[in-house]
Structure formats: structure tokens, C-alpha cells
């Protein structure tokens, strides 16, 4: 059984009840961190300017309060004591840093991260179904189970479909 750390607990407090229910259930069986829930206008504008998000304030699911979206990241167990940082969303520099720190190839780091992400996503999907909450993930915006047709991938992103 796992539990949320201080930062994840703070993020949890910004989430809508449906997301709280799902993450509270999921943490019982799978270890992950919550990176961000509610996003204020300044942060949303900054992310939009950097191309981190495609949605302007106030139209993002992170912009509601409580938030209808959360960014999550799995604890990558095969990377020894190195925890995938909250800043890692597939940025090449961070993949390179993890490869260097672990002595693994960048390709292997990606394989490990994507394997853990898929496991985490499956756990979240299962608890979404159990609790009757429809979710959308940042690797499959149109929810057709074809990740190759996406023009923007945001692996950490999970949102409630309303």
C-alpha cells in the first residue's frame, strides 16, 4: 500500500471530488506522484507561451476550481533509487539525464517510463470504471485507443469527461 507525499497531497486538495476518489483508490495499489491539479491564469499563460499546453486560460480542465484535470507521473521502479522528477514529461534533456545517471540507454529509459505509464493508466482506467467516472488521457485525446493519431501528447494529463 502506498500513500501520497506532501506535494501530491497539496495537489490532491485542488482536485474535483471525482478525481480525488480515483487517485485515492489508485494509490492503494500503485505508486505515483501528482504533479499539478488546479492551474492559475499566470501558470496557464506561461505554459501556453512555451507550448506546454494547447489551451488558453480559462478553457483548460486544469483551470477550473476544483480542477477537472490532474497531471500524474508513475514511480518508475526499474530506475533504482532515481525517481522520475515531476518535471519529466518526456523532455529529451531529462531522458538524457536519467540515462546518464543510471547507465542505461535513452531508448531503455523511454521503454521503462512508457511501461510504467501504461500500468498507471490501466489502474486509473479501472478505478474510473469502478466509480463511474469517464476519463480522458493526454496520450489519447479522442479516446479511440489509437495513440498514433494524436498531434499533441501530454502523458501526465488525466481529466474527467463532462
What are these language model-derived features?
Residues 6-9, 50-57:
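Phosphate-binding glycine-rich loops and adjacent basic patches that engage nucleotide phosphates
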Amino acid at each position: 500500500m502506498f500513500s501520497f507525499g506532501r506535494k501530491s497531497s497539496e495537489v490532491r486538495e485542488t482536485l474535483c471530488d471525482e478525481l480525488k476518489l480515483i487517485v485515492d483508490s489508485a494509490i492503494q495499489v500503485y505508486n505515483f506522484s501528482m504533479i499539478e491539479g488546479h492551474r492559475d491564469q499566470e501558470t496557464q499563460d506561461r505554459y501556453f507561451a512555451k507550448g506546454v499546453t494547447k489551451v488558453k486560460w480559462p478553457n483548460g480542465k486544469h483551470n477550473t476550481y476544483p480542477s477537472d484535470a490532474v497531471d500524474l507521473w508513475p514511480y518508475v521502479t526499474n530506475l533504482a533509487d532515481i525517481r522520475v522528477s515531476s518535471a519529466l514529461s518526456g523532455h529529451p534533456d531529462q531522458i538524457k539525464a536519467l540515462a546518464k545517471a543510471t547507465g542505461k540507454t535513452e531508448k531503455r529509459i523511454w521503454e521503462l517510463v512508457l511501461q510504467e505509464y501504461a500500468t498507471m493508466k490501466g489502474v486509473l482506467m479501472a478505478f474510473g470504471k469502478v466509480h463511474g467516472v469517464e476519463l480522458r488521457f493526454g496520450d489519447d485525446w479522442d479516446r479511440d485507443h489509437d495513440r498514433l493519431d494524436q498531434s499533441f501528447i501530454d502523458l501526465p494529463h488525466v481529466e474527467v469527461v463532462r
